[in-house]
Amino acid sequence: MPTPSMEDYIEKIYSLIETKGYARVSDIADELFVHPSSVTKMVQKLDKDEYLIYEKYRGLILTPKGTQMGKRLLERHALLESFLSIIGVDPSHIYHDVEGIEHHLSWNSIDRIGDVVQFFENHPDALKTLKAMETTKPETKE
């Protein structure tokens, strides 16, 4: 199992490849706000663990294992964003909240959250009822 840090890299690499068609060390460093040397070190570890194939100065490609994991991680992130939006979390907090919880939930929990999201997507009246339950509370300091 990849560590939370490895998951962040795999997710970002997958996302870059999906949007740009490639992922360079410099692109990954820019996206994750880390030094290129940190990316190189992690990419070498991900290569060793067979999530990707890395050749110095030539770039990297995800293996089928890495592609499958990257897709699942990106879907997990999007699902958690949807869930937090459905339950009424302030949009300005959603990204940060997802980053804070995504590595601490089991895949079983993620699947159950997916069921809840799907339920509300398929039952707009239930979603209206949930939204009606939301109360305005003063913002709490974090």
From Swiss-Prot:
Domain HTH dtxR-type as annotated: residue spans: 1-63
Highest rank taxon of the organism: Bacteria
Annotated Mn(2+) 2 binding sites: 11, 77, 99, 102
Annotated GO CC locations: cytoplasm
An MF annotation (GO) of this entry: DNA-binding transcription factor activity
GO biological process: intracellular manganese ion homeostasis
Residues given in the record as Mn(2+) 1 binding sites: 8, 99, 102-103
Annotated InterPro entries: DtxR_MntR_Metal-Reg (IPR050536), Fe_dep_repressor (IPR001367), Fe_dep_repressor_sf (IPR036421), HTH_DTXR (IPR022687), HTH_tscrpt_reg_MntR (IPR022897), Iron_dep_repressor (IPR022689), WH-like_DNA-bd_sf (IPR036388), WH_DNA-bd_sf (IPR036390)
Regulation: DNA binding is strongly activated by Mn(2+).
Localisation: Cytoplasm
Keyword annotations from UniProtKB, A to Z: Activator, Cytoplasm, DNA-binding, Manganese, Metal-binding, Repressor, Transcription, Transcription regulation
Family: Belongs to the DtxR/MntR family.
Known role: Central regulator of manganese homeostasis.
Classification via PANTHER family: IRON (METAL) DEPENDENT REPRESSOR, DTXR FAMILY (PTHR33238), TRANSCRIPTIONAL REGULATOR MNTR (PTHR33238:SF11)
Assembly mode: Homodimer.
HAMAP family per UniProt: HTH_MntR
Record-given protein name: HTH-type transcriptional regulator MntR
